[in-house]
Amino acid sequence: MTLIALILPAYLLGSISFGVLASRFFQLPDPRTYGSGNPGATNVLRSGKKSAAIFTLLGDGGKGWLAVALAEYSAPLLELGNEAVAAAALGVFLGHLFPVFLHFKGGKGVATALGILLGFNPWMGLLAATIWLAVALMWRFSSLAAIVAASLAPFYALFFLGFEARTLVVFIMSLLLIWRHKSNIAGLIAGSESRIGKRSTS
């Protein structure tokens, strides 16, 4: 029951889509209706409104960090350890991917995963962000940057965290994140994948 008390609020927090909220605030089309149909920062950027994309990025990343921070504060009070923090992290990530408020059709989890990594260990999060940024700047594909960063994440989780529950969650998140990019992988292979900053024509 104590774990559920951490997981459920984390899942509900993860279910908040900042891409949809930002689009409503800036009076933009729903991001689920154009581009990739994904309510994440990269697709919101295709609206041409950079401020909305930044809001989405900070919101989606912030909820991942917040879930971890709250769990780290609450776990000792509930006489729980890192397994509780790991459970909350997985809860907020699954909430983003399968949000109850959007009929379980959410984003791909890149920003939320980054927020979680920053919460687990700031250096680990910064390393992930640096890898993403380097790949994105070199090839201009957000999806490729996410896939590369996700593929490497379990290795630097082992380095910074060792063998423990949070490392297992990083591994699970990496698999889910890559799986959520399966259509992007097909696009990269076919040469039809959209580059960062390309505005939607739909």
Swiss-Prot record:
Domain of life according to the entry: Bacteria
Catalytic activity field: an acyl phosphate + sn-glycerol 3-phosphate = a 1-acyl-sn-glycero-3-phosphate + phosphate
Associated pathway: Lipid metabolism; phospholipid metabolism
Record-level Gene Ontology MF annotations: acyl-phosphate glycerol-3-phosphate acyltransferase activity
A single GO cellular-component term on record: plasma membrane
Membrane topology (UniProt): Multi-pass membrane protein
GO biological process, one term: phospholipid biosynthetic process
Record carries keyword Cell membrane: yes
A Pfam family assignment: G3P_acyltransf
Residue ranges of coiled coil: none
Leader sequence segment: none
This protein's UniProt keywords: Cell inner membrane, Cell membrane, Lipid biosynthesis, Lipid metabolism, Membrane, Phospholipid biosynthesis, Phospholipid metabolism, Transferase, Transmembrane, Transmembrane helix
Transmembrane segments: 1-21, 84-104, 116-136, 143-163
Main location: membrane
InterPro entries per record: G3P_acylTferase_PlsY
EC annotation from Swiss-Prot or TrEMBL: 2.3.1.275
Function: Catalyzes the transfer of an acyl group from acyl-phosphate (acyl-PO(4)) to glycerol-3-phosphate (G3P) to form lysophosphatidic acid (LPA). This enzyme utilizes acyl-phosphate as fatty acyl donor, but not acyl-CoA or acyl-ACP.
Subunit structure: Probably interacts with PlsX.
NCBIfam families, alphabetized: glycerol-3-phosphate 1-O-acyltransferase PlsY
Protein name: Glycerol-3-phosphate acyltransferase
Organism listed in the record: Nitrosospira multiformis (strain ATCC 25196 / NCIMB 11849 / C 71)
Name of the gene encoding the protein in the UniProt record: plsY
